[in-house]
Amino acid sequence: MDKEKLDVKIEYCNYAMDSSVENMYVNKVWVQCENENCLKWRLLSSEDSAKVDHDEPWYCFMNTDSRYNNCSISEEDFPEESQLHQCGFKIVYSQLPLGSLVLVKLQNWPSWPGILCPDRFKGKYVTYDPDGNVEEYHIEFLGDPHSRSWIKATFVGHYSITLKPEKCKNKKKWYKSALQEACLLYGYSHEQRLEMCCLSKLQDKSETHDKVAALVKKRKQTSKNNIEKKKPKFRKRKRKAILKCSFENVYSDDALSKENRVVCETEVLLKELEQMLQQALQPTATPDESEEGHGEEINMGEKLSKCSPEAPAGSLFENHYEEDYLVIDGIKLKAGECIEDITNKFKEIDALMSEF
């Protein structure tokens, strides 16, 4: 078979398929059986579809075509959506009611149960294409935790109680909890299901605006309070530093004044001590040289008598001089009250120095 004949045959097949699709589906309507154990799609003629009450459920036994009027009969071959597009057709989905329990087909995920509920931001649960047909649904997915998203109507179908769990590679616990929740909500009414949609509850726009404004105001007040709180802390620390510095200055001033006082008192005591020593030296000092020499001899004699180990301890003369005089560096000093006063002065000086 040459190439020209093959191209002609392919074109003929495409034309035959297009014409068959057109003849089969023009002026006809697909209706889904609402039996939860069936959910098959049946093709109705335009006359039969006109008799369908959209407010009432429809089942397979209501089909006038005897070939497909039982739930046990398999579904008719349904063309791919791309084939319909090539012929200029498109699938139009009827709008599912709010609060419906649905099953969503997701890529790389098992069919996931959810509830049709309003988007709290848009305030609606369905969007339409330019022709006025259903395009997307807002769905809150079941499971722990809930999640929400806008899904194309192509991937949204009725939930069936006979659904068998599919293989789930990831989030197995999440998928299991979603199926359990779907079984629980299956017997609920549409209104009760909407109450379970915690992520999608409608809020008044004015109320939302007020909440946002209150939140912004609260944040401003919080930031303002934080600034006000920070300022006193800074000032308090600054004041503490100033007080500490002042205290140290006062303390240092007190220490200096105390030091000056001790030094002055010590100087006074030293002067008094010097006067006492001068008074103690007066009896031994004589104006003429002969007396000075004589005094020196006496002093030397006293030195020898005191330093000599041979001198008797019980000598009255030495005892008299020991009681009345004290020899320091060869100088004879008056004893008695003068020596006692000098000792007391030294004690006072020691006390002042220890205090300093």
Swiss-Prot record:
Among Gene3D superfamilies, the record links this protein to: 2.30.30.140, 3.30.40.100
UniProt-annotated stretches for the region Disordered: 279-307
SUPFAM superfamilies for the chain: Tudor/PWWP/MBT
Domain PWWP span(s) in chain numbering: 98-162
UniProt GO cellular component terms: nucleus
Record's InterPro entries?
Answer: PWWP_dom (IPR000313), ZCWPW1/ZCWPW2 (IPR042778), Znf_CW (IPR011124)
Q: What are the residue ranges of zinc fingers typed CW-type?
A: 24-79
Which positions in this protein are listed as binding Zn(2+)? C33, C38, C60, C71
Q: Which GO terms describe its molecular function?
A: histone H3K4me3 reader activity; methylated histone binding; zinc ion binding
Signal peptide (from-to)? none
Q: Which UniProt keywords apply?
A: Metal-binding, Zinc, Zinc-finger
Effect listed in the UniProt record for changing W30P: Loss of histone H3K4me3 binding
Swiss-Prot/TrEMBL domain comment? The CW-TYPE zinc finger mediates its binding to trimethylated histone H3K4me3.
Q: What does this protein do?
A: Histone methylation reader which binds to non-methylated (H3K4me0), monomethylated (H3K4me1), dimethylated (H3K4me2) and trimethylated (H3K4me3) 'Lys-4' on histone H3. The order of binding preference is H3K4me3 > H3K4me2 > H3K4me1 > H3K4me0.
This protein is called Zinc finger CW-type PWWP domain protein 2
Q: What gene does this protein come from?
A: ZCWPW2
